[in-house]
Amino acid sequence: MSSRRSVGDPEYLTRRIPQNPRYQHIKTRLDTGSSLTKYIEKLEEIKRNYRYRKDELFKRLKVTTFAQLVVQVASLSDETLEVTNEEIHKLEGGNSPASDADAELTAGTNGKGSPNGTPPSPVLFINNAGAGESYRSTLQSLISGVGELDIEKDTHKKADTQAKDTPYPDCPFLLLDVRDRDAYDQCHIVGAYSYPIAMLSRAMNPYTNSILEYKNAHGKIIILYDDDERLASQAATTMCERGFENLFMLSGGLKVLAQKVPEGLITGSLPISCQVAAPTGSARKKPVPKVPPTRAESKWRYSAEDLQKIKYYLEEEQLPSDTASRLSRGSSGRDSKATTARSSPSLPSTAGSRMLSRSSIQNRPWK
């Protein structure tokens, strides 16, 4: 009997699918759960971006946690600044009745300070709202109130701009850049102080006044960062050995910061080693014009646009990526839609949910 022959090539199932280098950077959207391949990729990412050691004396601070801390501090400082401005305007408005009373007193003069009739009795000054003021001081307040009103407004505006150019008052963290001064002038995080690692080798006065103020202070921390944890880990270890207990290192440095929050936190142009590489397998390679690197600004506070960018990237990082969380999010979304459809005919938009998530980020206390 002749042996039965199988249909098709037996090596068809073991044949590997040829890979196109053009689409190697595109990842699958189907998440099959935990696997050895994903675990190896995660380990490679950790080795590429982080430098963990078993005997680390310092504590680490994630980039996302630092961004949340920045948003909370900036929003709280802006609220207190608005409250103080409102109080100043209220105090300025409270002086208007006194100026009206002064105008009534000057109505009895001929414009040169000489009274038309009998001089006012001392009883008027006692019963007046400005008790204890003499006739001369009342006229002086009137003169200063007419001509110097615009000057006072300009001084308030200058004070507001000067307050925005200074660091945040009572900031819970002190951010130190341990790179060289040239690298700091090229690019740094907003609100960071330049503190090169060579300062630790000084025999006399190795620390600045701000570092001594924040050292082991209650409710305050010191954060060190660099490009890729090489210098920051050495500086953090040395400072912890010298008695700093509230010291943290920004995990990943500017390299991970450029990946997680590429806009809003940094002023100046990032170094080439920290820039995110473009995907290699592109359909058409377009020539990218080279932009000259810009110098970092002397910037101590975040603008409203910077805070919006930081919140946007924080929302992108907090979105769940695994299948189970997506399924749970979808089921909870369907349940919430059903309940809202019963209660109200209109469904909430995604913008409302984003605003809720942003407010929840701001309401979280920093740790």
UniProtKB/Swiss-Prot annotation:
Residues 169-266 form the Rhodanese domain. Pfam families: Rhodanese. It is found in: Cytoplasm, Cytoskeleton, Microtubule organizing center, Centrosome; Cell projection, Cilium; Cytoplasm, Cytoskeleton, Cilium basal body. Residues 89-121, 319-367 are annotated as: Disordered. One of its GO terms (biological process) is cilium assembly. SUPFAM superfamilies: Rhodanese/Cell cycle control phosphatase. Belongs to the CEP41 family. This is Centrosomal protein of 41 kDa. It comes from Gallus gallus (Chicken). The lineage of its organism: Eukaryota, Metazoa, Chordata, Craniata, Vertebrata. The gene is CEP41.
